[in-house]
Amino acid sequence: MVGFCAAALAFGRVASVLQSIELLLAVMGPRPAAFVRSFEPARHRTGIDPLVHRWIRGRDLVALLLVLQRMLRESGSIERFFIAGDDPGASDIGPALEAFSTRALQTDLTAAYGRMPKRAGVCYFFPRPSGGSACKRLNLFLRWMVRSDAIDLGVWTAVSPARLIIPLDTHVIRLGRCLRLTRYISPGWKMAAEITGSLRALDHADPVRYDFSLCHVGMMNACGFGRAQGSRQCPLRGVCRPKERVRN
């Protein structure tokens, strides 16, 4: 429960992300799952309505909690709700994400919005590959839940790490181009899937294992892409080809 809420708000400046997550968890209390199960908008929204994260407002968080509540009531956990729409035979997790977000947004959200707005903030929490979205935050959540090592929690057992798609942030986009892991220029599901496919050639069983390293090369400002002289400190110096971009 905490992982999903954290991933849902993982956009924007790191300090702002951490602050928003802390504020939401403070409202949810020491037992977040129990809070979600007993969540009542009329009773609890006074603590949530003041919360703002970028364009997300309190009512969007109320809607998110209603969706999570439905998952718990219908399936017992987010994992069971997710795998109900999964096809283990699918080559990657894309079809399962499509079903997951579609079913999630079928939740009755009248208590959050009254009449559902066309661009309701809750839709941002549940993007779909069919819309072209890279589904970065959902893929980040799945990485945390499915992979098991010193970085990720690995508390889900029904999904294979081999089927995960890399969370496509700005650092992965840049390095994916530089390392020729993708020929796409425009970020989206196709780029995320192609980068993952390239990484799968290195580790078919766990292609997303490289996400943390790729992301942090960029976060540590070690990548020389875009600098006049490059960077002598860049660990990828000599293997990247930033100018080779072929298709949209």
Predicted regions and their residues:
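HhH-family (HhH-GPD) DNA N-glycosylase catalytic core used in base-excision repair
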Residues: 1-248
